[in-house]
Regions:
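Metallo-beta-lactamase
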Residues: 2-5, 99-148, 192-198
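Conserved beta-strand hairpin/beta-sheet module of binuclear metal-dependent hydrolase folds
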Residues: 2-64, 150-153, 157-161, 254
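Active-site metal-binding motif and surrounding structural segment of the metallo-beta-lactamase
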Residues: 40, 51-98
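Active-site neighborhood of phospho(di)ester-bond hydrolases with catalytic His/Asp-centered motifs
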Residues: 45-47, 69-77, 97-100, 159-163, ...
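Short acidic active-site motifs
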Residues: 84, 282-286
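FMN-binding flavodoxin-like domain, especially the glycine-rich phosphate-binding loop
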Residues: 171-211, 215-218, 260-276, 286-384
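Short N-terminal or domain-adjacent regulatory/targeting segments
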Residues: 212-239
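Short, charged N-terminal beta->alpha structural module
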Residues: 246-268
Length: 384
């Protein structure tokens, strides 16, 4: 696939993968993107997952024929983008490997110290002339690994963005970009908002008309939309007005409380209510909803003098991703010593700019008139 005269796509689709990074459900598979920049000299941009080495090398051969690549640029050492380096260098031993010092250290760890015959160690801001095209290397540490580099090609106004602007799904999946890009971002990159903000500031100084990520489609239209979403996500802003309700329930009584709240919110005109049963839903989708909307309600029974395990895991997932700038409401249930609300509130004590609603709902075993009234009051408070 030719993206621009001189820039070609040589990546692969993975239709068989079920769990990405060993935890994220990917029903529509994954794309591992790789590119060739062909000028007077030729540069390969990253490799692909180890299961697709033969297909990837065949893509290179089909495009270049007997010509040998001059460079392979390693922007990111995570194995879904670097695992084929040894096979590549067995085929093209004279090709120079271009990467920063941290990436070469990781390369030694993954492959041993004798992998590369020719190394070109780059620093932040270095350039590499291919002919008419010049590659500019921009370090993007912790987006989302420490060695990450992105690459800008001035002639084509193209940014090779590593894992930035990536998404779940193969390239032939027909779906809205934002949904799976959001789930990917908050699952994998979400902790590193400050680092993404730093990269966006660097990118703002560039004239970009095309973004080539390592996962998902090449972006070449309406870039302001994608960059705007990344700015919102990485600054922990509110993307959409609405309420995410995340709940766990043992015998259905806490679920009934969550459902009543959802009904009341809708009756009051809440623009969106996203319900997540944490025992049954994809946890990454629940995390996605919690970051998408400005308000979150957590509903949990007390269990072993603590929060129900699925809820505890969910709160941990939010906090480790720097959950902030949100309003949280709490619903607890307990038959003799309800303490879940206190525990859930305490879990966010180190989080920034979290506001708890004045109304906290306590259900004593099952809903009654008092707890229903409290739920209705919570709905009104959330809709102010």
């Amino acid at each position: 696939m030719t993206l621009e005269h001189g820039i070609h796509y040589i990546g692969v689709n993975d239709y068989d993968i079920r769990l990405f990074e060993g935890q994220y459900h990917v029903p529509n598979g994954m794309a591992y993107n790789s590119y060739i920049i062909a000028d007077e000299k030729t540069a390969v941009m990253d490799s692909v997952d180890k299961h697709f080495s033969a297909e990837w090398l065949a893509n290179i051969k089909k495009l270049l024929g007997d010509k040998k690549p001059d460079y392979i640029v390693v922007q990111h050492m995570e194995p879904d983008h670097s695992a084929c380096l040894a096979d590549f260098l067995a085929e093209y031993p004279e090709t120079a490997v271009v990467a920063n010092a941290k990436a070469f250290t990781m390369m030694d760890n993954f492959f041993g110290k004798d992998l590369c015959k020719n190394k070109l160690v780059i620093n932040d801001g270095n350039t590499l002339k291919l002919g008419e095209r010049e590659l500019k290397f921009i370090f993007a540490p912790m987006v989302h690994w420490p060695e990450v580099t992105v690459t800008y090609v001035d002639k084509d106004k193209t940014l090779f963005s590593a894992d930035g602007f990536g998404k779940f799904g193969t390239l032939d999946t027909d779906e809205d970009w934002a949904c799976e890009a959001r789930r990917y971002y908050f699952g994998i990159v979400g902790k590193y908002g400050a680092q993404v903000q730093a990269l966006l500031k660097k990118a703002a100084a560039l004239d970009i008309e095309r973004i080539c990520p390592l996962h998902g489609p090449v972006l070449n239209e309406n870039l302001g939309y994608y960059i705007g979403l990344y700015n919102t996500w990485s600054s922990y802003g509110v993307e959409s007005e609405g309420v995410c309700i995340a709940y766990t329930s043992v015998y259905g009584n806490t679920e009934k409380a969550a459902e009543r709240l959802a009904e009341q919110l809708k009756a009051l005109g809440c623009p969106k209510v996203a319900m997540n049963n944490l025992a049954l839903c994809d946890p990454a989708e629940a995390v996605e909803d919690a970051f998408r909307y400005g308000k979150l309600v957590l509903a949990s029974p007390t269990y072993n003098g603590d929060v129900f395990p699925f809820m505890k895991h969910f709160i941990d997932a939010l906090c480790e991703r720097n959950y902030q700038n949100r309003t949280i409401g709490l619903i607890e249930n307990g038959s003799w010593a309800p303490i879940a609300a206190k525990k859930m509130r305490a879990a966010f004590e180190k989080s920034r700019n979290i506001t708890f609603t004045d109304t906290t709902v306590t259900v004593t075993s099952a809903l009654n008139d008092d707890s229903r009234a409290k739920i209705d009051a919570l709905a009104k408070e959330l809709c102010r």
